[in-house]
UniProtKB/Swiss-Prot annotation:
Name used for this protein in its record: 3-isopropylmalate dehydrogenase
UniProt binding sites for substrate: R90, R100, R128, D222
Species whose genome carries this gene: Burkholderia multivorans (strain ATCC 17616 / 249)
Annotated site (Important for catalysis): Y135, K190
Root EC class: oxidoreductase
Cofactor (UniProt): Mg(2+); Mn(2+)
Any one of the GO BP annotations: L-leucine biosynthetic process
Name of the coding gene: leuB
Amino acid sequence: MKIAVLPGDGIGPEIVTEAVKVLNALDEKFELEQAPVGGAGYEARGHPLPDATLKLAKEADAILFGAVGDWKYDSLERALRPEQAILGLRKHLELFANFRPAICYPQLVDASPLKPELVAGLDILIVRELNGDIYFGQPRGVRAAPDGPFAGEREGFDTMRYSEPEVRRIAHVAFQAAQKRAKKLLSVDKSNVLETSQFWRDIMIDVSKEYADVELSHMYVDNAAMQLAKAPKQFDVIVTGNMFGDILSDEASMLTGSIGMLPSASLDKNNKGLYEPSHGSAPDIAGKGIANPLATILSAAMLLRYSLNRAEQADRIERAVKTVLEQGYRTGDIATPGCKQVGTAAMGDAVVAAL
């Protein structure tokens, strides 16, 4: 089994190193091949997603991704900025389903900004569609307004759109995920205002006829954002579009105490996927050895489970992470009084020892 390892920028190389360390500690050995991406790709090959990196990603059975982005690239034209690498990978590999778990570990309840009784036992899965919506809809741009009260003035515009096949395929993925959990699925939209959202809701209802064992409900995105902060444990699996999912998954991540704990998976129709931590590249702490590698290590566990069908090995890694937390090890972002505060490499070593 071949894994493409794309560390990226900022803290990416540090946290990916620890995930690779954990993978190498397993009984089964994998072929790991590394390539530059993001700002590192631009520096090495003049593009955030070099041809050789894309070729490796296509040939691999799965991709372990760090993070991309750095302020020093903000002056580049948009097509050359590091963030275009992840968008390009999603497009070329046809990764359309993003899984973002939000789990509050018992040992980290006090790290959450919410009261312990609100988050104890929290276990949410957000399924986000990745390829459509306003992020990719055309036309888009800046122009002179053709009409309206400010006709002739400059305006920016984007297009929110979804095709029926796009909505149906993410619906099936979400319903199947719900079948494996509590058999509850919440679809989040803004159908009281947006035609695209009403279209989304209608298709969700239609697809639900194929999943009689799953209870489908609906919620407007503004209410969902409020309810995530007010009573998050009412949710199990949430399915939503690209933009709403982007926002809600970041909100849900903070309920757990630290975004540094949360993995994610982006899958194609055959479960080949790209696995990355939910957090960004954090260039302000890059090279300091203090970043939390657990989200990346847990992303490696998701990689084993979903793309390589190695559920037992994935379980081992997840149990090891829980053991490390029970032993009191903490990086700075999840540190609490009386804990054993450690750096990036020491946390990786602790997980390997727990294996």
